[in-house]
Amino acid sequence: MGSRGQGLLLAYCLLLAFASGLVLSRVPHVQGEQQEWEGTEELPSPPDHAERAEEQHEKYRPSQDQGLPASRCLRCCDPGTSMYPATAVPQINITILKGEKGDRGDRGLQGKYGKTGSAGARGHTGPKGQKGSMGAPGERCKSHYAAFSVGRKKPMHSNHYYQTVIFDTEFVNLYDHFNMFTGKFYCYVPGLYFFSLNVHTWNQKETYLHIMKNEEEVVILFAQVGDRSIMQSQSLMLELREQDQVWVRLYKGERENAIFSEELDTYITFSGYLVKHATEP
């Protein structure tokens, strides 16, 4: 009973010492007392189990300075005072720390177009640029001139049909706008033209001609029957478009109708020229 009680007591003391942090200081003292008891011839009588338990409890009970109240019972599972007090860990305010600049991110999607702004002020005139190279030659422009003057040296008499007066003498025919074979002037330059017709009448015969525009009778040249021949003329201005035709027509022979001329002299003339081009203001 004595050795078993001592074992239980020793285990109880070790638990109390571990809990209170005094195990290292108390274990050698207990071992020394046991050696003294073993060296004596007569061992003291072991105290009662209850008394020894109270004595050990009083010896190893934590003092009031350690923070436990006197009225509180200490159990073997209660935590004791820590042998190594925790040190305060310094705190770092990460909001004041600035890290290194990161890599550039990927390009984002294009945003929507904003509202159109107001027009800015007119800028300053820039410096004069260098002279450019010469361009390619352009197309040849059309001539803005037209003129003709023709004559006839042969007399002409009417018959049962209308006759175009054909001229055999060319005085002026700029750019060949007057066709000597057909006896007609062809308009290649649109604009305002002046025309003049001069004839010599025949004695005792009527003179009856028209200046024609395309197939339209425009003006008449007329002379009644007379004992003497005379020079008769007619003139006018016409506005022509391209491809219009102007010519002279002898009236058909309801009555005897004729114009006089001879090989030695020119008695019949027809002239015309451009006064104003159509594109001119």
Curated annotation (Swiss-Prot):
Can you say what this protein is called?
A: Complement C1q tumor necrosis factor-related protein 1
Ranges of Basic and acidic residues composition bias in the record: 48-62, 100-109
**Which PROSITE patterns does this chain map to?**
C1Q (PS50871)
Q: Which residues are glycosylated?
A: 93
Tell me where on the tree of life, at the top rank, the source sits. Answer: Eukaryota
Query: What ranges does the record give for the region Disordered, renumbered to this chain?
Result: 34-68, 100-138
Signal among keywords: yes
* Entry keyword set: Collagen, Glycoprotein, Secreted, Signal
Query: What positions does the domain Collagen-like occupy?
Result: 99-140
Q: What subcellular locations does the record give?
A: Secreted
| GO MF annotation list | collagen binding; identical protein binding
List GO BP terms, alphabetically: negative regulation of platelet activation; negative regulation of platelet aggregation; positive regulation of aldosterone secretion; positive regulation of cytosolic calcium ion concentration; positive regulation of gene expression; positive regulation of MAPK cascade; positive regulation of phosphatidylinositol 3-kinase/protein kinase B signal transduction; regulation of glucose metabolic process
